[in-house]
């Protein structure tokens, strides 16, 4: 937990199987070894982006990866008491929940020819392929609202 700069508080997780940035991270780049996460601008300046190795020995090896990326969350017609958004009292709203799909890029320290990616639907099934581009010899994919998802699958060959 890094709370050294007011308004930029964040948690960075860097383990062999999970890389994650949580908090007020808009516009910063996080080089976590074989994975780099660059959160974009969000409604509240806050997001959570997690990159988890589901299969394989490491992010530079063959395997599969799950990415989850979210920002602002609230129920439909949720009634905040004031602009600080610290309480809704008893006005929790109703379904469906509304979740901000954040803009971010995630890069892997492997060639783009080794990587395929998909946006996942609400059942965890592949919904559409996501472009993977080469940037400085690394495979980079762009997350965001056009994909209409919070979850992505990445396959490294």
Walk through the language-model features, giving the residues of each.
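Long, low-hydrophobicity ectodomains and other hydrophilic envelope-associated domains
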Residues: 1-119, 123-126, 136-138, 145
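Alpha-mannosidase-like glycoside hydrolase catalytic domains involved in N-glycan trimming
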Residues: 130-133
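C-terminal beta-strand-rich structural cap/linker in extracellular carbohydrate-active enzymes
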Residues: 137-157
């Amino acid at each position: 937990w890094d709370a050294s700069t007011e308004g930029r508080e964040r948690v960075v997780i860097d383990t062999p199987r999970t890389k994650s940035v949580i908090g007020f991270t808009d516009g910063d780049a996080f080089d976590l070894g074989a994975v780099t996460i660059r959160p974009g601008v969000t409604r509240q300046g806050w997001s959570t982006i997690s990159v988890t190795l589901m299969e394989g020995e490491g992010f530079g090896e063959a395997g599969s990866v799950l990415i989850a990326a979210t920002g602002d969350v609230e129920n439909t017609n949720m009634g905040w008491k004031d602009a600080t958004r610290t309480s809704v009292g008893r006005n929790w709203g109703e379904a469906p929940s509304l979740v901000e799909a954040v803009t971010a890029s995630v890069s892997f320290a492997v060639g783009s020819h080794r990587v395929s990616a998909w946006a996942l639907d609400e059942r965890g099934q592949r919904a559409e392929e996501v472009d993977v581009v080469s940037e400085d010899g690394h495979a980079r994919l762009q997350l965001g609202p056009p994909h209409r998802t919070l979850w992505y699958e990445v396959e490294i060959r």
